């Protein structure tokens, strides 16, 4: 195993243990499933009776857990600090639902020939919409700042 892989494996083990310890403060004692996707540490928390609490409104608590793990990695000198935390496959299910909704928006734009301005969404959701729209041949543009950042779907230029 080369030095880079060893550093990533060490970061994965640290992140897994840190999240398990953090969850234990909430009375959740379980084994977090840890993998890697390129240089992103993927941490999957199995379903528990506290799913709603751990996920939070629109995934806010889950993003906070992700931030805490990433910050702990940085503060402890790990080179790899990009982390994705998913509780009970929430992100995967949300991405699937969002892709289906995006396909409906795309159909409306194609049928009307008019651009459609979407409501503000987080960066992860915008990435999904950009990808689905690109695959369907539409042009997208992100506009706004911070929590007001949103996408404009545009018909493809003829």
Task: Give the ranges of each region predicted by the language model.
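RNA-contacting regions in translation and RNA-metabolism proteins
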Residues: 1-158
